Amino acid sequence: MTNSQSDAALAAVLDRFDPSAGGPGAYDTPLGITNPPIDELLDRVSSKYALVIYAAKRARQINDYYNQLGEGILEYVGPLVEPGLQEKPLSIALREIHGDLLEHTEGE
């Protein structure tokens, strides 16, 4: 293999992992605290403290929903987005908030 061939092969491998070159990137985009971005979540509430309370309340509802499934009681609403495998209730709640799937009045 000549130098130019090895350089071309290396460039092809690098392009495969470069999202700006149309590749998927080295890693999938993680869900949860880093995705959706905090800045976009803060656009939906008045402060970071309101976001914490809002997300925590919804995560608690999702957790209670999963706990009640075995009892046959359907008092709580389940996730409004498709949960990922082993995805935590807080991550689900943040994705619901980001998707504007919930209505929230601050102070409640």
UniProtKB/Swiss-Prot annotation:
Task: Give the function comment from the record.
Answer: Promotes RNA polymerase assembly. Latches the N- and C-terminal regions of the beta' subunit thereby facilitating its interaction with the beta and alpha subunits.
Q: Which HAMAP family match?
A: RNApol_bact_RpoZ
NCBIfam families documented for this protein: rpoZ
Write out the catalysed reaction: RNA(n) + a ribonucleoside 5'-triphosphate = RNA(n+1) + diphosphate
EC number per UniProt? 2.7.7.6
Give UniProt keywords alphabetically. Answer: DNA-directed RNA polymerase, Nucleotidyltransferase, Transcription, Transferase
Protein's name in the database: DNA-directed RNA polymerase subunit omega
Q: How does it assemble?
A: The RNAP catalytic core consists of 2 alpha, 1 beta, 1 beta' and 1 omega subunit. When a sigma factor is associated with the core the holoenzyme is formed, which can initiate transcription.
What do the Gene Ontology cellular component annotations say? DNA-directed RNA polymerase complex
Q: Which GO terms describe its molecular function?
A: DNA binding; DNA-directed RNA polymerase activity
The protein's matches in Pfam families, at most eight in alphabetical order, are given as: RNA_pol_Rpb6
| Enzyme type, top EC level | transferase
Do the record's keywords include Endoplasmic reticulum?
no
Q: Which is a GO BP term held by this UniProt record? A: DNA-templated transcription
Q: Where are the transmembrane segments?
A: none
Q: Which family does it belong to?
A: Belongs to the RNA polymerase subunit omega family.
At the top level, the lineage of the source is Bacteria
